[in-house]
């Protein structure tokens, strides 16, 4: 079979690739691929391998997702091979009509990256249509008087094919009276005319039947036939004659129905009824109407240039005798700008990434205007200020691409309006709008609402309580804007961080894992991070400083005097002759809190003799308020309370035992009668003390024996005289509880003589000793502790002399309140430096005071009767100076210079004191 019988599978397919380079500013290379195929190819037929022609490999096809974008689905692309396949019937006559060239243009779309490729498939005509007449038979009346050579226009056949496959010629069945003449119109179409070869005789043959055949130029040619019936009429000498054989006129397509197109006119030289001419269309017209009397042709319907550009009609003029004349009327329709351009989007991206680079392809725009000429020339523009632009890709085809940076956080979507305007007069335009949504990318890091955070948390907070909350916002969407919180770093120990704080990843709330202690941890800093869930994730850090607020959770601690298990201190001795204002002792306390919570005040809760003593509210100094009366008891008891400034205040109490006496002998009964405080670990300590005592006794016996043997050999009698009966004191230092552990920021360790456990050994000194001779008992530090006094003292071994005024403190050197002392109570210490060893020895020696005239309380020049007293009250902000913790008991004694001056007054002699004591003994 030939091409006309459907051998479409073997038709040639000639793919031709054309590459059209756009300007350098075009972001992509636009390729146009041309194919040529015959019409009526069966579905599934291969047009060509589109992937190969585009340079795609088979491996790329799954990712590139090559597909066809067109208004009608004539073609499709195989996802496996990339071949362009026929998907619907291709009828050239239906698609293009009588156009000499028929091509289907569409776009091939490839993704990753997105690009468009123009494809042109030319549809070749095949001889699949036969010429057809509108009717199977036609009737024609010819007068017997018609002269040979007279021509009659016959019905034309229609062939939908073009070119050689269209109608090419006509054939007429053989008849000696008629012949066939073929003529051609201006558009190239052919029509037949019947020519009379000889005169007809109606009396011989009144009816003729002829067969008219129309043939195309196909191979083999196709044909169509119609029967021509000729009726011979009676003679009419003069037939009608038209003014012109062909009437041509141009008509605008926008004329309304009823518009007069033209008027045909014919004349007949006959008279009477034979000269009356009536006009009619040779073929029935539907668009135009003809006035049979006047020959006026008018429009019957609205004309449309886009449907039919030209009309050709045959008008007959028939006289009353039956003679007929024919003329041709050709009406050319002029195009008017009556069609607005049509704008359509193809392969529009639903979402555009906000980080798309300028020039990213968004959509393909197709412009179509049914008008022709300038009326069909269209200009496309983008309305408004948007970060997009349109680029001409081919005729009536544009690309919509990005023309700037996109930011979804500022503009999440764009309403893009594209206007197409033709060049008609007046120009027509149409617009189409589309909303382009911007897809979010993780381009915004979380931002904290504050540059840094500072919170205050009171101590002793409940574990698990929230102490702070941070908040960060992320302008992105979805996971890109979902923020989680964590602790990145801190100034705490890494291992201890988890035991202090934790953080909620969702809410940003920071929780305390434990109760904070202001005395252990006053402040700490955390580095918090907010991180989104994007890929890659973005984060931001912020510092959170936590200040632990102090609460009054620590009661004052009494450091001095050292308290026993029952809360009472050992006795302090006050001279009977003490004047009002005499400094008896000083209560020293500290508070581990700070601020007002550590501001201590001292109060007397109970006194055995009210009004006898006064207590400094802030200094804690216990002074005599008046002189001792005859009715006043020698032993006094003061219950002192130390309160802090917290709300509510916390307090501690201390019981002071004060004894008015001038010598230790007066208070010995009180000392021996006083019960020894019980020790919780007395049993264990007892065994330890016994063991140590045995070892010490054995060692001392060995040393004494060695010294005695050596002195036996010595010739110095003075050395032996020291071992004569006299006064020797053995005392053991007692260390109060250690306050270095706990919540105090500073440690206070005191070493004082525990007078309750002091032992006295009375030895009789040798009378051979000179009054100026003293035994030096001490270490290399130079501290002098005389055990044997001058001969003057031996005359009254049982008397206690009052302390020497040379050892009294000056007003400027008295201990006072730290931090907030009055100007008159503030003084500086002497410039001479005391070694640590000397002070320790002085403190230990203060517990050993002689009971007779040779005791350290006498008025001898070498006397150093010392008792440890803690210095001024200290708060947590001051570190105590150990030099302030020593003063002379029994009086306001102060260390003086060699001249013995104290505050501008001459010191009282020691001998006078001794005489006064002697008088008391005599009484």
From Swiss-Prot:
Query: Disordered: where is this region?
Result: 794-832, 893-923
- The Cadherin domain extends over 31-133, 134-242, 243-343, 344-448, 449-558, 566-671
| Subcellular location as annotated | Cell membrane
Any single GO CC term annotated in Swiss-Prot or TrEMBL for this entry: plasma membrane
Residues modified by carbohydrate are: 415, 541
Which portions of the chain have biased composition (kind: Basic residues)? 913-923
Question: Which residue stretches does the UniProt record annotate as biased composition, category Polar residues?
Answer: 807-832
Its GO biological process annotations read: cell adhesion; homophilic cell adhesion via plasma membrane adhesion molecules; nervous system development
Q: Does the keyword Cell membrane apply?
A: yes
Q: Where would you say this protein principally sits, based on its record?
A: membrane
The positions making up the signal sequence are: 1-30
Species lineage: Eukaryota, Metazoa, Chordata, Craniata, Vertebrata
Describe the function of this protein. Potential calcium-dependent cell-adhesion protein. May be involved in the establishment and maintenance of specific neuronal connections in the brain.
List keywords of the entry alphabetically. Calcium, Cell adhesion, Cell membrane, Glycoprotein, Membrane, Repeat, Signal, Transmembrane, Transmembrane helix
Specify the protein's topology with respect to the membrane: Single-pass type I membrane protein
CDD domains xref list: Cadherin_repeat (cd11304)
What residue ranges lie in the Extracellular compartment? 31-687
Q: Which Gene3D superfamilies match?
A: Cadherins
Q: Which InterPro entries match?
A: Cadherin-like_dom (IPR002126), Cadherin-like_sf (IPR015919), Cadherin_C (IPR032455), Cadherin_CBD (IPR031904), Cadherin_CS (IPR020894), Cadherin_N (IPR013164), Protocadherin/Cadherin-CA (IPR050174)
Membrane-spanning residues:
688-708
Protein name (database record) = Protocadherin gamma-B5
- What PANTHER family has UniProt attached to this entry? CADHERIN-87A (PTHR24028), PROTOCADHERIN GAMMA-B3-RELATED (PTHR24028:SF73)
């Amino acid at each position: 079979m030939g091409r006309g019988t459907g051998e479409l599978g073997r038709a040639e397919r000639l793919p031709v690739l054309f590459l059209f380079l756009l300007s350098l500013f075009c972001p992509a290379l636009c390729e146009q691929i041309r194919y040529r195929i015959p019409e009526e190819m069966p579905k599934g037929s291969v047009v060509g391998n589109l992937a190969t022609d585009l340079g795609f490999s088979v491996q790329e096809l799954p990712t590139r997702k090559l597909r066809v974008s067109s208004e009608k689905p004539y073609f499709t692309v195989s996802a496996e091979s990339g071949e362009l396949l026929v998907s619907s019937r291709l009828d050239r006559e239906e698609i293009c009509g009588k156009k000499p060239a028929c091509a289907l243009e569409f776009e091939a779309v490839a993704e990753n990256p997105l690009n468009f490729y123009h494809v042109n498939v030319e549809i070749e005509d095949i001889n699949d249509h036969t010429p057809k007449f509108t009717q199977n038979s036609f009737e024609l009346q010819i007068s017997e008087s018609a002269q040979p050579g007279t021509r009659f226009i016959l019905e034309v056949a229609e062939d939908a094919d073009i070119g050689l496959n269209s109608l090419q010629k006509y054939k007429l069945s053989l008849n000696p009276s008629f012949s066939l003449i073929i003529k051609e119109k201006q558009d190239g179409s052919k029509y037949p005319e019947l020519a009379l070869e000889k005169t007809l005789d109606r009396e011989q043959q009144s009816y003729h039947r002829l067969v008219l055949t129309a043939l195309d130029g196909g191979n083999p040619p196709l044909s169509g036939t119609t029967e021509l019936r000729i009726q011979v009429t009676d003679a009419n000498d003069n037939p009608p004659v038209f003014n012109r054989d062909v009437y041509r006129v141009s008509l605008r397509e926008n004329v309304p129905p009823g518009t007069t197109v033209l008027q045909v006119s014919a004349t007949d030289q006959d008279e009477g009824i034979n000269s009356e001419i009536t006009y009619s269309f040779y073929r029935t017209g539907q668009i135009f109407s003809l006035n049979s009397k006047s020959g006026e042709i008018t429009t019957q319907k609205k004309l449309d240039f886009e449907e039919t550009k030209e009309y050709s009609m045959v008008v007959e003029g028939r006289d009353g005798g039956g003679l007929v004349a024919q003329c041709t009327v050709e009406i050319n329709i002029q195009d008017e700008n009556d069609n607005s351009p049509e704008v359509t989007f193809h392969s529009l991206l639903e979402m555009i990434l906000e980080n798309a680079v300028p020039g990213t392809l968004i959509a393909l725009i197709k412009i179509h205007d049914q008008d022709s000429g300038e009326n069909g020339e269209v200009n496309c523009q983008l309305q408004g200020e948007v970060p997009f632009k349109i680029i001409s890709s081919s005729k009536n085809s544009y690309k919509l691409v990005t023309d700037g940076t996109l930011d979804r956080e500022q503009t999440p979507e764009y309403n893009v309006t594209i206007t197409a305007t033709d060049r008609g007069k007046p120009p027509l335009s149409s617009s189409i709008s589309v909303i382009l949504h911007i897809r979010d990318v993780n381009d915004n890091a979380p931002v904290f609402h504050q540059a840094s955070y500072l919170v205050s948390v009171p101590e002793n907070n409940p574990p698990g309580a929230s102490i702070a909350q941070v908040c960060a916002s992320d302008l992105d969407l979805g996971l890109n804007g979902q923020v989680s919180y964590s602790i990145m770093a801190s100034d705490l120990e890494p291992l201890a961080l988890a035991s202090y704080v934790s953080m909620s990843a969702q809410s940003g709330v920071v929780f305390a894992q434990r109760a904070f202690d202001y005395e252990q941890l006053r402040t700490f800093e955390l580095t918090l991070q907010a991180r989104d869930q994007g890929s890659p994730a973005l984060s931001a850090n912020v510092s959170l400083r936590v200040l632990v607020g102090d609460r009054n959770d620590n009661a004052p601690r009494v450091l001095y005097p050292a308290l026993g298990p029952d809360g009472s201190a050992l006795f302090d001795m006050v001279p009977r002759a003490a004047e009002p204002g005499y400094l008896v002792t000083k209560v020293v306390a500290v508070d581990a809190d700070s601020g007002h919570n550590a501001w201590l005040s001292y109060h007397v809760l109970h006194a055995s003799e009210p009004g006898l003593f006064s207590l400094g509210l802030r200094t804690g100094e216990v002074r005599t308020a008046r002189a001792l009366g005859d009715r006043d008891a020698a032993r006094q008891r003061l219950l002192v309370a130390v309160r802090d400034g917290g709300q509510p205040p916390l307090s501690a109490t201390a019981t002071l035992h004060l004894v008015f006496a001038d010598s230790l002998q007066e208070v010995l009964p009180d000392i021996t009668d006083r019960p020894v405080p019980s020790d919780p670990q007395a049993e264990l300590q007892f065994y330890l003390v016994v063991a140590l005592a045995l070892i010490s006794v054995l060692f001392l016996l060995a040393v004494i024996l060695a010294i005695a043997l050596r002195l036996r050999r010595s010739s110095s009698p003075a050395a032996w005289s020291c071992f004569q009966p006299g006064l020797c004191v053995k005392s053991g230092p007692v260390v109060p509880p250690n306050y270095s552990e706990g919540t105090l920021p500073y440690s206070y360790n005191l070493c004082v003589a525990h007078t309750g456990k002091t032992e006295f050994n009375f030895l009789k000194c040798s009378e051979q000793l000179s009054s100026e001779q003293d035994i030096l008992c001490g270490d290399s530090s130079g501290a002098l502790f005389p055990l044997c006094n001058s001969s003057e003292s031996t005359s009254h071994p049982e008397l206690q002399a009052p302390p020497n005024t040379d050892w009294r403190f000056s007003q400027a050197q008295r201990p006072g309140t730290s931090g907030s002392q009055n100007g008159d109570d503030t003084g500086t210490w002497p410039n001479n430096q005391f070694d640590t060893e000397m002070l320790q020895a002085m403190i230990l020696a203060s517990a050993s005071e002689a009971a007779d005239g040779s005791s350290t309380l006498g008025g001898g020049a070498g006397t150093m009767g010392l008792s440890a007293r803690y210095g001024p009250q200290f708060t947590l902000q001051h570190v105590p100076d150990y030099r302030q913790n020593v003063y002379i008991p029994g009086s306001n004694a102060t260390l003086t210079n060699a001249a013995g001056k104290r505050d501008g007054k001459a010191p009282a002699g020691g001998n006078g004191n001794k005489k006064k004591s002697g008088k008391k003994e005599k009484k």
